[in-house]
Structures are given as structure tokens and as C-alpha cells.
């Protein structure tokens, strides 16, 4: 403000004009940016319901819009930002991070309403996925789009495809066209053991004893530790020790179940959840009781629509039966991001954010969901808990061999006659797994194998007598990880195999750190050009291992180094 003299000599108080760059701007006479229309807000409310709206549920809201609209219209995203009272940029960065969301700007055409996803990961490619993709592209199918997709967890029925939410095992053009013509794109729910059947065989007895005080937390942790139960999602960390670490942290505490088994070649969790979901759920509820978790978040991949529906049905049954009184259970649906299998990235996604791995320390056992101590366990790890506690540590530990403890669920796919989940002793060899799967396919000779999915590297047939368990393969530059075993034959070019795996990692890199983002891209370009300079690729691999934030970048080069 300043004083100005008028013509009659009086003084008036006037407002000084802001000069450019002063940092003080006049308020805009109109709102900047895209204007939200009332009908857009009404449309979003109709899909996600009336409030109160929660910021951590952003991804769930995006799913509801995507499912209904077959895309994410810009106006709906704007309305969602207003309802959540967060910046539009925050909604946009999440929506564009996940592969299963299709953001459509104003004026852009919506994608075709029917989406066919064909898996192009290793097992499916060996089973003819490339030819299937090309054939589908040549078909005249109105209102249909065909997309390549990373592993959908159906490697035992390769080549696999998904039409909407319906899986098509051993997919052919004819099978897929039949689904499209029929118009039923909902998941096919397999026959599974429900709550009544599980309780009839004694299910939830152990949980009941825990809640009644008959069993102590200390005795349960001791039994799991003596039995040798380890994390079966890939890391192999001792379960009892992890529970002890979380219990030592001050509450409130949370628990997260990692059901995002996106490692190509892995399908064991789906196998159990589609057959005996309550054995897993009882193990989960025992774990929640042991660490006094006030809420459990089951993070399940979007590629498992049948599992998501089963969990919805059976959690409601548990609620009705009064078995969820000691904790709250919520299901969070992934959206096509492999990186969310990394525990801290999964926690970011549970909080409704981009799935970017966190820097550690602190570890999630100390600072996890909503910055509280969090127990993270894999589906199969929890699956074995009721039986171990019922039958004893000696029962479980005694099933291993070659120095290993317990049993293992090996997901076996590739060039075997009968792919599937092989439940057998920990420490089993690949030679024994091939025999359990009916031997090699006719006309194929065993050449090599992936012992633990793409991250685990590639081993030659000459090392077929190695026991497959945690710690047994590291001296060969490999590891067993999630026990995803892919069998290769003399018909497979190892360089083509390694390129397929590296292309997967390039596509799934979250892009947060340069060694992984640029390293995978550079490796793919070198491999595609035919320039397999061993020194260059080895140097690149070393940088990725040493400097990447998480396991994706650290392990991405394993298949490449394996074929030198």
C-alpha cells in the first residue's frame, strides 16, 4: 500500500501493483487448468460410493473406475483427486505407474472394451505364445485389443491368456474367440475347500487354542524355529526370528501378506489358494495373533481374479463365524506391477502409492505400513503354520533331505510332460523333479534349467544333482528363490532365453534407480544387437548388483552372466 494525492488535495490509500518476479501474484480471475464438471464427480461417486474417502484406498478406487469404464478417463481422475483432497498429480502418478490402468486424456479414444492379455514370459513363449499373439493380431475381432503381458501365474497350462478376468489355459485362437463370443469375462472359480469343510477336518483348532491361551506365543515361535520354517517367497528368512523381531518393536503393529507372486515360473501360491484357502487363512490369523497385529493386509496380484473372489467369500464367512475378532483383515488388489513383490514396494502400494522400493534401513519390521512395525509373510509360509503346530517341529524338519529341513512346493514348468506344483522334500534335485513331472517332453533332451525363476539364474544339465534349497546354489551364481523351476531343452537357444528374461526385467523396472533402469535397457540393446561382449555385460552386471536399490536390479543380470 502507498499514499497518493488526488486532484482536490486529499490523500487516499492505494494498492501497489505487483511487479514481475515479486513473488506476490494477483489471484487468478478464473481457475487454472481443466475444470471439473459436476457430472464427473457424480459418476465417480456412483462407482466408489459415498464418503468418507480414504487416501490409502486410491488404488482400490482406481480399480473400481477401470473395471466399470474399461479405462481411467481424465475427468474421473480429476473428480477423484477432489474427493480425496489431494493434488491431481498425485492421482496421475499412481494411475500411470501400474500396467493394468489405462489413463485416457480428454479427446483421446478409449481402448477397446475387451482386453486379451497373452503371457509372453519364458514358459509361455516356449509353448508357442509368440505365434498365438501374431495369430490373434490377424483376427477380425471388433471391440477387442490384444496385449502382451508378463507372467500371469499359469505357467503349468502354457501358453496362457486372460480375456477380461477369465483365464484361458493352454490358449488357442479358437478358445479365446469362443470366450469373446460368449461374452463371459468373469473369473472361473475352481472347486475349493470352504470353511465348513476345513473345520470338519479340524481346521482352526490351533487358532482356537491360541486365542484361548492354551498355547503361548513363545512356544509357537519355538516350534516354527525348530521345524526350520523359512520365508518361501524367495528370501528364505527364518520365520520364527522374523516374528521375534516384529514383537520386539513397540505397537501398534501391522501385518502384510505378500501374495504378489509375479516371478515368471511361479504359481505355487495360486495352487494352494485355489484349493485350500483356509489353511493359509488360519496360518495368517495365528501370525496376526502372535505379533498382535491390529490389521492384516492381504496383497493379492490382479492376475489372480479367482483367488480374489475366493478370499472375498471366505473372509466374509470367517467374519460371520466370529474368527476375526482379534484383528481386522483387508484385501488389497495389485495392478500389474512385478516390483510390488518386493516387500517395501508392496507396502507403498498398500498405502495407495506407486510401488517404489524403500531405502533400507530402517526395515519394514521397524517402519512398515503407515510407519509402524510390520510383519510380512509369504502365502505359502503361512500355509504350513497350522500343520507344523499341529504335528510338531520334528514332523516338518524331518521331511527335508541333503541337509535341508522341511518340504518345498516347486513350481515346475517348461519342457516337461506334466508341469505343475511338486510338493516334495526340501533339497530335492532337478533330476528328481523332472521325473516327478513325467520326464522330458517327447523329442526334447534336458539342457539346462532356471532353479528360481529369472532372478535365480540359469544352470546347465550337468549340475542336475544339486540339492535345490536356500544357500545351496550361491557358489554357482544362482539361487533357488521362490522355487520356480523352468526346464530347458536342446530346442532352446540359451541366448534367446536370457534375452526374454532381461526384457522382462527391463519392462518391470520401476525406474527409481539409474543402475536398474538404465542397466536393464542397455543390456537388452546389447543382446538384441547380437553384441554379447562378455566384458561389457559383466561390467554392467556388476554395477547393477552393487548399486541397485532392490533385488530386481541386483538379480536382473543373473541369467545373462549364466550363459557366458
Regions found by a protein language model. Give the residues of each.
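Flexible inter-domain linker/hinge segments
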Residues: 179-226, 371, 377-392
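Hydrophobic alpha-helical positions that pack around
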Residues: 308-426
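Ferredoxin-type iron-sulfur electron-transfer modules in oxidoreductases and energy-metabolism complexes
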Residues: 26-116, 120-186, 205-226, 250-255, ...
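Short amphipathic, charge-patterned alpha-helical segments
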Residues: 283-285, 426-441
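Structural motif
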Residues: 114-117, 144-145, 160, 252-255, ...
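Histidine-anchored nucleotide/phosphate-binding helix
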Residues: 98, 276-290
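Accessory "access/gating" subregions that flank catalytic or transport cores
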Residues: 210-249, 411, 423, 442, ...
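Gly-rich Lys/Arg/Thr-decorated short loops/hinges at beta-loop-alpha junctions or inter-strand turns
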Residues: 199-205, 257-269, 364-369, 411-416
Amino acid at each position: 500500500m502507498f499514499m497518493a494525492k488526488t486532484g482536490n488535495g486529499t490523500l487516499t490509500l492505494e494498492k501497489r501493483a505487483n511487479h514481475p518476479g515479486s513473488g506476490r501474484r494477483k489471484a487468478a480471475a478464473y481457475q487454472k487448468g481443466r475444470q471439473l464438471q459436476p457430472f464427473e464427480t457424480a459418476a465417480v461417486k456412483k462407482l466408489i460410493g459415498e464418503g468418507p474417502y480414504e487416501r490409502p484406498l486410491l488404488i482400490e478406487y482406481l480399480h473400481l473406475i477401470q473395471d466399470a469404464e474399461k479405462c481411467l478417463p481424465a475427468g474421473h481422475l480429476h473428480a477423484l483427486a477432489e474427493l480425496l483432497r489431494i493434488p491431481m498429480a498425485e492421482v496421475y502418478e499412481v494411475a500411470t505407474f501400474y500396467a493394468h490402468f489405462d489413463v485416457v486424456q480428454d479427446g483421446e479414444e478409449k481402448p477397446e472394451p475387451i482386453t486379451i492379455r497373452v503371457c509372453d514370459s519364458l514358459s509361455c513363449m516356449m509353448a508357442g505364445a509368440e505365434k498365438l499373439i501374431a495369430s490373434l493380431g490377424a483376427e477380425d475381432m471388433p471391440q477387442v485389443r490384444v496385449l502382451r503381458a508378463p507372467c500371469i501365474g499359469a505357467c503349468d497350462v502354457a501358453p496362457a491368456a486372460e480375456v477380461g478376468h477369465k483365464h484361458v489355459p493352454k490358449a488357442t485362437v479358437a478358445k479365446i474367440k469362443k470366450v469373446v463370443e460368449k461374452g463371459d469375462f468373469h473369473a472361473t472359480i475352481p472347486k475349493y475347500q470352504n470353511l465348513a469343510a476345513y473345520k470338519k477336518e479340524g481346521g482352526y483348532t490351533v487358532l482356537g487354542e491360541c486365542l484361548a491361551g492354551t498355547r503361548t506365543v513363545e512356544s509357537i515361535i519355538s516350534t516354527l524355529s525348530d521345524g526350520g520354517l523359512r520365508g518361501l517367497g524367495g528370501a528364505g528368512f527364518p520365520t520364527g526370528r522374523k516374528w521375534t523381531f516384529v514383537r520386539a518393536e513397540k505397537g501398534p503393529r501391522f501385518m502384510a501378506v505378500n501374495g504378489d507372486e509375479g516371478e515368471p515360473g511361479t504359481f505355487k501360491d495360486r495352487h494352494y489358494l485355489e484349493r485350500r484357502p483356509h489353511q493359509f487363512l488360519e496360518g495368517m490369523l495365528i501370525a496376526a495373533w502372535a505379533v498382535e497385529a491390529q490389521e492384516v493386509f492381504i496383497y493379492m496380484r490382479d492376475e489372480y481374479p479367482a483367488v480374489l473372489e475366493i478370499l472375498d467369500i471366505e473372509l466374509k464367512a470367517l467374519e460371520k463365524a466370529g474368527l476375526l475378532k482379534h484383528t481386522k483383515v483387508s484385501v488389497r488388489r495389485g495392478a500389474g506391477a512385478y516390483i510390488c513383490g518386493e516387500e517395501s514396494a508392496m507396502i507403498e502400494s498398500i498405502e495407495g502409492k506407486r510401488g517404489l522400493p524403500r531405502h533400507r534401513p530402517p526395515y519394514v519390521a521397524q517402519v512398515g505400513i503407515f510407519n509402524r512395525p510390520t510383519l510380512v509373510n509369504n502365502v505359502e509360509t503361512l500355509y504350513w503354520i497350522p500343520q507344523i503346530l499341529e504335528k510338531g517341529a520334528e514332523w516338518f524338519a524331518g521331511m527335508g533331505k541333503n541337509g535341508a529341513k522341511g518340504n518345498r512346493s516347486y513350481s515346475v514348468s517348461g519342457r516337461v510332460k506334466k508341469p505343475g506344483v511338486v510338493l516334495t522334500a526340501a533339497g530335492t534335485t532337478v533330476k528328481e523333479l523332472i521325473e516327478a513331472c513325467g520326464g522330458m517332453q517327447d523329442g526334447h533332451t534336458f539342457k539346462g534349467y532356471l532353479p528360481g525363476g529369472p532372478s535365480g539364474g540359469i544352470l546347465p544339465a550337468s549340475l542336475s544333482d544339486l540339492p535345490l534349497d536356500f544357500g545351496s546354489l550361491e557358489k554357482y551364481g544362482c539361487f533357488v528363490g521362490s522355487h520356480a523351476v523352468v526346464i530347458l531343452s536342446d530346442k532352446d537357444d540359451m541366448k534367446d532365453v536370457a534375452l526374454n528374461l532381461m526384457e522382462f526385467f527391463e519392462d518391470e523396472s520401476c525406474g527409481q534407480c539409474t543402475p536398474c533402469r538404465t542397466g536393464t535397457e542397455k543390456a537388452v540393446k546389447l543382446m538384441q544387437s547380437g553384441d554379447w561382449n562378455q566384458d561389457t555385460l559383466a561390467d554392467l552386471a556388476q554395477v547393477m548388483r552393487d548399486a541397485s536399490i532392490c533385488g530386481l536390479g541386483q538379480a536382473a543380470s543373473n541369467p545373462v552372466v549364466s550363459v557366458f
